[in-house]
Amino acid sequence: MVSPEADRVLRYLVEVEELAEAVLSDKRQIVDLDTKRNQNREGLRALQKDPSVSEDVMVCFGNMFIKMPHLKTKEMIQKDQEHLDKEIERLRSQLKVKVNRLLEAQGKPELKGFNLNPLNQDELKALQVILKG
């Protein structure tokens, strides 16, 4: 029979491992989505440089190439970019919570400044007005 102390340590290690696995999983997903976002950005840039707007372009979906209208392709990639941006932002906000839970389970203090958010355009403009005078 396992002693109560060993059982408690085992439960603690299982909890910490599960929390750490969730953090690593989210980080990996963010990296994968960011890679896809960069590929989309490259595709959009190539479409912007292409002067033949009236011609169809070849688009790769997985392992298959499809000929699509230039404008429709551009719109589709832009919508995908918006979706990826939202998904990455959602994962990053969840990641902050999961990291705090992991630190709490390990008995470590919460990271300072980890919950900061960047200023949006309106806040930045207001700050610039205040600083100018």
UniProtKB/Swiss-Prot annotation:
Top-level taxon in the UniProt lineage: Eukaryota
Record key words, sorted: Chaperone, Cytoplasm
Localization, UniProt: Cytoplasm
Organism: Rattus norvegicus (Rat)
Main location: cytoplasm
UniProt record similarity statement: Belongs to the prefoldin subunit beta family.
Function comment: May play a role in chaperone-mediated protein folding.
InterPro entries: PDRG1 (IPR030482), PFD_beta-like (IPR002777)
Assigned GO CC terms: cytoplasm; prefoldin complex; RPAP3/R2TP/prefoldin-like complex
Oligomeric and partner information: Component of the PAQosome complex which is responsible for the biogenesis of several protein complexes and which consists of R2TP complex members RUVBL1, RUVBL2, RPAP3 and PIH1D1, URI complex members PFDN2, PFDN6, PDRG1, UXT and URI1 as well as ASDURF, POLR2E and DNAAF10/WDR92.
Listed GO biological process terms: protein folding
GO molecular function per UniProt: unfolded protein binding
Protein's recorded name: p53 and DNA damage-regulated protein 1
Pfam families attached to this UniProt entry: Prefoldin_2
